[in-house]
């Protein structure tokens, strides 16, 4: 495990001079997601223990922690992907702009339109680049070619991919490099204009250059969406996030602005993890 140098977040850096939010006292207008006393079980095994936190709008929030700590489970709870797991049950609430996503009347398909997700490995469909991007729009019933064309271009531009593929939109997406495929998947996710974008270790299968491109993209995406990212890479969390949550064995140990968590953590477990004493 590599420790984080405080110099990376020293005063004068972009991350250090950004205005900090009081995460314990956000106004309703500042909150995208409000998680309240969330518990999740796989059968009798408890994977999340009474998680309570608020995730701000228009910022990047990172979940970090050792393997098996619950960070990906928490991420998947935000768009109810855990519903697909046998014998999984949940108590507590996750409120998206004030509405509990676990209310029995919630349309889960509509929820997943509002809360998009990108996984560890790029998963383009065996279709053209264009059809990958507009896939969700077609599912929603959009068939107007002009609107589809506009959405495809806008989404590919937002994903920093347009200039690389604009002359081969009707070629197979499977011919793209790994980094390009991951940006294509991000373009597909944002084409339907979600409110929140979930990224589950989006660069773990990519080379360093592609990783840097995705990290720069994340910084741009928060201008349009609320972004929540799971990462094993603490340097990445320090680079891309505005606030960071450290999890351990299903518990939320510490949650604060990223600069504070990596330079002056309040909890001994957090300090031990970020300095490489375990994990």
From Swiss-Prot:
Major localisation: membrane
Pfam family, one: ABC_tran
Catalytic reactions on record: phosphate(out) + ATP + H2O = ADP + 2 phosphate(in) + H(+)
GO aspect biological process, one term: phosphate ion transmembrane transport
Keyword Transport: yes
Keywords: ATP-binding, Cell inner membrane, Cell membrane, Membrane, Nucleotide-binding, Phosphate transport, Translocase, Transport
Subcellular location: Cell inner membrane
Top-tier EC class: translocase
GO molecular function, one term: ATP binding
Membrane topology: Peripheral membrane protein
Residue ranges constituting the ABC transporter domain according to the UniProt record: 33-274
SMART domains per record: AAA (SM00382)
Disulfide bonds: none
Family recorded in the similarity comment: Belongs to the ABC transporter superfamily. Phosphate importer (TC 3.A.1.7) family.
Primary role: Part of the ABC transporter complex PstSACB involved in phosphate import. Responsible for energy coupling to the transport system.
Name recorded for this polypeptide: Phosphate import ATP-binding protein PstB
Gene name as annotated: pstB
